[in-house]
Amino acid sequence: DLDHLARLAVTVDAKVLLLSHMRGHICDMDLLMQICDGAGVKVVEDCAHTMGGAWNGVPSGRHGAMAAYSTQTYKHMNSGEGGILTSDDPDLMARAIVLSGSYMLYARHRAAPPPEAFEQIRWVTPNVSGRMDNLRAAILRPQLADLPRQVARWNALYHAVETGLRNTSGLRIIERPEQESIVGSSIQFRLPSFSEAQIAAVLKACAARGVDMKWFGGAEPVGFTSRYD
């Protein structure tokens, strides 16, 4: 709700917006950045579900000050655990490198900003030992090169399923904006007129046919869903 965000941006003393592109859906990033830039709010993008996607031709994660991409087991690239940070801001990347556990060996980092970016940061930044090891990096490199092919394959499957579901009675497809280049690694739809019992029956019937679906909104957290009371 970008109207709500615009109101909050001028009434709340926020410095950073952590934006999660949940389940691969990208909002109007042009308008969001206009709101946040106007209010002096830095944007950090959680691109765990949009790695390989884009908004208006700009890759997901390239709008904000920094982006995080997960490479956990169930993401678009799989190294078991871990992830990738990207930014054009040398201060942010210098801090990330020292935080990751570089000690004073930051100059060995092949993607590091110039040494002067570390001059002040190295004195005030703790070492939390969150670095990626070479084995995970080696596992990810061929997957990164293969990502465009994977995105095209997922999208073909996504659109086939979307076509099959469209016009199904009681089911509402999530329409995607023209500006959004999707990564169709998962698909969502709504059952707005169904009761909880009816939704549970749909899940059970689909599971019996080998189609495993997750219900976001159920009383009990299951699988990828979570709940915090």
PLM region descriptions:
Residues 174-229:
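Conserved PLP-binding catalytic core of the aspartate aminotransferase-like
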Residues 50-56, 63-186, 223:
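Active-site region of PLP-dependent enzymes
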Residues 22, 144, 192-193:
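Conserved donor-binding loops in enzymes that form glycosidic bonds
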Residues 1-79, 84-92:
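Active-site phosphate-binding strand-loop segment of PLP-dependent enzymes
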